[in-house]
């Protein structure tokens, strides 16, 4: 089977960059780099194993089929995505304490 194409939403890109900036300001470059590597690892994993992330149970029918995976080393941060045979679409990369259904 062909590996699906990766698509990052504008919101996911903004989430990742916002968190990099936050870590740079709070803890410096080493933690920001660790975050970038962890997000890259999580994205690579869902592209390779898209069915591995559990389905989310949101009330909204528009969010059916959304899956999640934790960011390694940052377990409170979650990557939300959908997939089909052709692509893995990353919706958001956010802290799990936020109003997730509203954000997605």
Q: Where in the sequence are the language-model features?
A:
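Short, charged, intrinsically disordered terminal tails
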Residues: 2-3, 7, 61, 99-104
């Amino acid at each position: 089977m062909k590996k699906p194409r990766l698509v990052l939403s504008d919101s996911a890109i903004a989430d990742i960059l916002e968190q990099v900036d936050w870590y740079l300001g709070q803890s410096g470059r080493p933690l920001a780099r660790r975050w970038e590597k962890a997000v890259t690892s999580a994205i690579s994993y869902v592209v390779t194993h898209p069915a591995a992330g559990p389905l989310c149970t949101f009330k909204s029918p528009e969010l059916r089929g959304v899956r999640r995976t934790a960011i390694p080393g940052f377990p409170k941060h979650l990557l939300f995505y959908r997939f089909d045979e052709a692509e893995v679409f990353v919706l958001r990369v956010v802290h799990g304490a936020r109003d997730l259904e509203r954000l997605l």
